[in-house]
Amino acid sequence: VKSPIKHVESEFYAECPNVGTVGTMGGVTANEIPFIITQLEVGNTDENQNVIQDFGSTIWDFKTKFLSPRITVKPYTNNGTYKLYVKLYKDGVLKAGSSSPAGYSYTADVTISGRGEQVFTLTGWGSSTAGYWQMGDYRFEIWYGDYCIGSKSFKVN
């Protein structure tokens, strides 16, 4: 999977420590990856995905509700709905809840329509109560099948 990703300028490529490694979902080969992520930004949203702190801007702990990844993708296929597996780490520890898939924080579906660049805001992780996330170092990883296809490290201040 590294060769198709390398030809796209991607700000997170060096951050994805597990790119091309085997995950726990199985059943997907590198040739079946439907798109590559060319940009990944994180924003602070409410439970309805209204933006509280814009994607790519400073995130302040006292305002945090849902940490939401926004991905820009370059499709290899024309159409389809694809399940992504999302990992959210705080200070190196995977965040998971009782309904989280094993080894992941949550899942999100994206629907590709056409071959042009597309942007998706994935569901966030958090609470409707402001101040949910504390200061620290965080990282989102986006997985498709066995492959880490994007990652972004960020801070909550």
Predicted regions and their residues:
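Surface-exposed loop/edge segments in extracytoplasmic proteins
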Residues: 93-105, 148-150
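Conserved aromatic beta-strand anchor motif in extracellular beta-sandwich/beta-rich domains
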Residues: 84-90, 142
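Contiguous beta-strand segments within globular domains
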Residues: 43-83
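Short beta-strand elements
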Residues: 3-27, 147-157
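Short, solvent-exposed, Trp/other aromatic-anchored flexible loops in extracytoplasmic proteins
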Residues: 1, 73-75, 104-137
